[in-house]
Amino acid sequence: MANSRRVSKVSSLIKREVSLMLMQDIKDDRVGAGMVSITEVEVSGDLQHAKIFVSIYGSEEARAETMEGLRASQGFVRRTLGQRIRLRRSPEVLFIEDRSLEEGDRMIHLINQLEIKDPEELEAQESEEMV
């Protein structure tokens, strides 16, 4: 098993290389259907598996199409990583859609919708209701 420092370094290298592949090397038109960004890469302790979390901006149809294209390109990504990063074995690559940014936006929107009232206004309103 690799130490945590090595795992972290490999994770950041994979993130950088896959980002470059998304911009330059992956030719599948489905991947271009939505704007894709890599939010995180989790590499297993033995460096054999890499979960690549992607955030996709666009409609639901574009997201589904983009994920389809990314899944179809997993073999290409694994081979290319093997050529660009010096590892004994190329890690198995798995793309996972990350909706945490979308959830964060939704939470911020809900918080902004709440009306935060001044305590004095609340007291005045309550006293009016009692009369």
UniProtKB/Swiss-Prot annotation:
<dbReference type="GO" id="GO:0030490">
    <property type="term" value="P:maturation of SSU-rRNA"/>
</dbReference>
<dbReference type="GO" id="GO:0043024">
    <property type="term" value="F:ribosomal small subunit binding"/>
</dbReference>
<dbReference type="InterPro" id="IPR020053">
    <property type="entry name" value="Ribosome-bd_factorA_CS"/>
</dbReference>
<protein>
    <recommendedName>
        <fullName>Ribosome-binding factor A</fullName>
    </recommendedName>
</protein>
<comment type="subunit">
    <text>Monomer. Binds 30S ribosomal subunits, but not 50S ribosomal subunits or 70S ribosomes.</text>
</comment>
<dbReference type="InterPro" id="IPR023799">
    <property type="entry name" value="RbfA_dom_sf"/>
</dbReference>
<keyword id="KW-0963">Cytoplasm</keyword>
<dbReference type="InterPro" id="IPR015946">
    <property type="entry name" value="KH_dom-like_a/b"/>
</dbReference>
<dbReference type="Pfam" id="PF02033">
    <property type="entry name" value="RBFA"/>
</dbReference>
<dbReference type="GO" id="GO:0005829">
    <property type="term" value="C:cytosol"/>
</dbReference>
<comment type="function">
    <text>One of several proteins that assist in the late maturation steps of the functional core of the 30S ribosomal subunit. Associates with free 30S ribosomal subunits (but not with 30S subunits that are part of 70S ribosomes or polysomes). Required for efficient processing of 16S rRNA. May interact with the 5'-terminal helix region of 16S rRNA.</text>
</comment>
<dbReference type="InterPro" id="IPR000238">
    <property type="entry name" value="RbfA"/>
</dbReference>
<keyword id="KW-0690">Ribosome biogenesis</keyword>
<comment type="similarity">
    <text>Belongs to the RbfA family.</text>
</comment>
